[in-house]
Every structure is written in structure tokens, then in C-alpha cells.
Amino acid sequence: MLAPRVSQALIRSFSSTARNRLKNRVPEKQKLFQEDNGIPVYLKGGVVDHILYRVTMGLCLGGTAYGVYCLAWASFPRNK
């Protein structure tokens, strides 16, 4: 019975202290993302969003090209 009490006390103390130290930045982010400035919403986060978008698109294109290559390779049987 002691173990659940100790773990519950640790969880409660960690969650309450962490919650008090964080600043609520939701209104700032809402203002940023709701601004009508012509930038797509998936790029409004800054440089990190630009890099993440480019990497994601590169991986998607690379995966698609590799899938087409594998299908083409599998569709032509080897000569024995």
C-alpha cells in the first residue's frame, strides 16, 4: 500500500510544479496563426516549419519514386 501512495505523491508534485512554471502562450499563437497575411498556415511557424515542410515533401517524393521503382522492378521478371 505504501508504493501507490508514494508514486501518487510524486506524480502529483511533478505535474503541479511543471504546470505552474509554464507560461500560457496560446493567445500569442492564436494571434499569429489567425493573421491574414497570405502565408499558408503550415508555414506560419517560422524557419522550423519551412525546414519540416521541405523535409516532409522530400521524403514523400523520395518514397513515391522508390515505390514506383520497386513496382517497375517487380513487374519485369529476370531471365534465367
UniProtKB/Swiss-Prot annotation:
Q: How the protein sits in the membrane?
A: Single-pass membrane protein
Q: Where is the transit peptide?
A: 1-21
Q: Where in the cell is it found?
A: Mitochondrion inner membrane
Q: Which domain of life is it from?
A: Eukaryota
Q: Which CDD domains match?
A: Cyt_c_Oxidase_VIIa
Q: Report the transmembrane regions from the record.
A: 47-75
- Cellular component terms, GO, for this chain's entry? mitochondrial inner membrane; respiratory chain complex IV
Q: What is its main location?
A: mitochondrion
InterPro entries, per this entry?
A: COX7a (IPR039297), Cyt_c_oxidase_su7a_sf (IPR036539), Cytc_oxidase_su7a_met (IPR003177)
Please list the residue ranges that the record places on the Mitochondrial intermembrane side of the membrane: 76-80
Q: Does the keyword Transmembrane helix apply?
A: yes
Pathway it acts in?
Answer: Energy metabolism; oxidative phosphorylation
What UniProt keywords are attached to this protein's entry? Membrane, Mitochondrion, Mitochondrion inner membrane, Oxidoreductase, Transit peptide, Transmembrane, Transmembrane helix
* Entry GO MF terms: oxidoreductase activity
What is one process in the GO biological process aspect for this record?
mitochondrial respirasome assembly
Mitochondrial matrix topological domain: 22-46
Q: What's this chain's function? A: Component of the mitochondrial respiratory complex IV (CIV, also named cytochrome c oxidase complex), the last enzyme in the mitochondrial electron transport chain which drives oxidative phosphorylation. The CIV complex is the component of the respiratory chain that catalyzes the reduction of oxygen to water. Acts as an assembly factor that specifically drives the homodimerization of CIV complexes, mediating the formation of mitochondrial respiratory supercomplexes (respirasomes) containing two CIV: supercomplxes with two molecules of CIV show improved activity.
To which protein family does this belong? Belongs to the cytochrome c oxidase VIIa family.
Q: What is said about its interaction partners and assembly?
A: Component of the complex IV (CIV, cytochrome c oxidase), a multisubunit enzyme composed of 14 subunits. The complex is composed of a catalytic core of 3 subunits MT-CO1, MT-CO2 and MT-CO3, encoded in the mitochondrial DNA, and 11 supernumerary subunits COX4I1 (or COX4I2), COX5A, COX5B, COX6A2 (or COX6A1), COX6B1 (or COX6B2), COX6C, COX7A1 (or COX7A2), COX7B, COX7C, COX8B and NDUFA4, which are encoded in the nuclear genome.
Please identify the protein, giving its name as recorded.
Cytochrome c oxidase subunit 7A1, mitochondrial
Q: What organism does the record attribute this protein to?
A: Saimiri sciureus
